């Protein structure tokens, strides 16, 4: 065996500066969070949502973006994984305006000092100019994720201004209507624009080329079909009809994991609503009965419980909310012990649309299994 530094250079693998991941075939990961912060800032910072003669409604601060965002290239395809939380301040500034003063109090008829609606010099009373007033608060977008990238995200808002008088209270009521009718839709629209820009910026060049080539091939095929002359069929012509081979439209996912806990504890993580909320950190619902419905990550994952065998097996129908209507997969989760102080968790999911397979697989690993192990310390070894 050669000593260190004496090996044949022809057999040494180097990390070269001029090396290339040809056609994006090998797995590569790019951190998109800095780009995301800059892009989201440009979409929101100081943007005017609505302006009238009466008020200006705008974003008043640079958005604060936290979370993670990566673009993973594998075999020429780009897989985006992101979970972002965005917060920003807003304000509605009511412009100064002229208002007529309240009418004077009318004294009894015939009084010597009756007050007319005009000043002592006979001129009408001057209008009063109101002061500029500002109502402010915060927008929060708690969950921009690849799980619900095709949907408008949830947007929450708070109002920081206190209604200390009737006039301010009236202004706040008006602002609440503005937030619902213009503020929330604006934030949702800008978030969806961010997703489009993200995919446009980081999608692999190979994937774009393949898409363009496919479009060109389709155009060529259509042109050829239009110009070709259909041959005449005579009595001596024999036609053989062959049944075209159908490509599969779904795939089956199989995952195995080891949890350092009992089968009942492992089972409970998937059916206990409090534990589901703990590791997903999101809105969840779960009817713990056969035939009961469930949803995770604010409805991004939906399904129905078919079989619930405590400590043994769970069978569910399962779908992502962006799948076509009527498309469902089936998930079977089994729990077993194999002589070690741990539980074997095996997940088999059938009927996954091919285009959604990699996203579904990564979602199970990253958003469910890894989170369970980290939240409940089920990955720690027992000696």
From Swiss-Prot:
Chief subcellular location: cytoplasm
Annotated GO CC locations: cytosol
Stretch forming the signal peptide: none
Annotated region (Disordered), positions in chain: 97-126, 209-228
GO molecular function, one term: ATPase activator activity
Domain of life: Eukaryota
InterPro entries: Aha1, AHSA1-like_N, ASHA1/2-like_C, START-like_dom_sf
Statement: the UniProt record of this protein carries the keyword Transmembrane helix: no
Subunit record text: Interacts with hspD/HSP90.
Family statement: Belongs to the AHA1 family.
Name this protein carries in UniProt: Activator of 90 kDa heat shock protein ATPase homolog
Species, as recorded: Dictyostelium discoideum
Name of encoding gene: ahsa
């Amino acid at each position: 065996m050669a000593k260190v530094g004496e090996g044949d250079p022809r057999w040494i693998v180097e990390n070269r500066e001029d090396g290339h991941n040809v056609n994006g075939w090998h797995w590569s990961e790019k951190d998109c969070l800095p780009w995301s912060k800059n892009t989201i800032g440009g979409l929101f910072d100081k943007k005017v949502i609505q302006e009238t003669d009466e008020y200006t409604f705008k974003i008043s601060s640079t958005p604060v973006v936290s979370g993670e965002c990566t673009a993973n290239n594998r075999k020429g395809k780009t897989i985006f994984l992101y979970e972002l939380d965005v917060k920003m301040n807003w304000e509605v500034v009511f412009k100064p305006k002229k208002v007529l003063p309240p009418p004077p109090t009318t004294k009894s008829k015939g009084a010597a000092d009756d007050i007319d609606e005009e000043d002592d010099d006979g001129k009408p009373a001057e209008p009063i100019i109101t002061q500029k007033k500002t109502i402010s608060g915060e927008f929060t977008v708690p969950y921009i994720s690849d799980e619900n990238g095709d949907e408008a995200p949830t947007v929450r808002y708070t109002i920081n201004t206190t209604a200390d008088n009737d006039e301010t209270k009236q202004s706040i009521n008006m602002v609440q209507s503005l937030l619902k009718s213009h503020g929330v839709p604006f934030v949702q629209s800008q978030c969806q624009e961010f997703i489009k820009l993200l995919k446009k910026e980081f999608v692999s060049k190979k994937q774009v080329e393949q898409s363009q080539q496919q479009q060109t091939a389709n155009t060529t095929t259509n042109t050829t079909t239009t110009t070709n002359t259909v041959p005449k069929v005579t009595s001596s012509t024999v036609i053989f009809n062959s049944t075209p081979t159908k490509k599969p439209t779904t795939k089956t996912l199989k995952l195995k994991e080891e949890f350092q806990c009992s089968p009942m504890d492992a089972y409970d993580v998937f059916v206990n609503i409090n534990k589901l909320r703990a590791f997903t950190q999101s809105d969840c619902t779960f009817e713990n009965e056969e035939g009961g419905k469930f949803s995770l990550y604010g409805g991004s994952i939906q399904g129905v419980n078919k079989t619930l065998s405590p400590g043994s097996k769970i069978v569910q129908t399962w779908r992502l909310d962006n799948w076509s209507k009527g498309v469902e997969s089936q998930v079977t989760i089994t729990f077993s012990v194999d002589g070690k102080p741990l539980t074997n968790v095996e997940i088999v999911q059938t009927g996954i649309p091919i285009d959604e397979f990699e996203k579904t697989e990564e979602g199970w690993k990253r958003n469910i299994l890894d989170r369970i192990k980290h939240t409940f310390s089920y990955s720690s070894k027992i000696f």
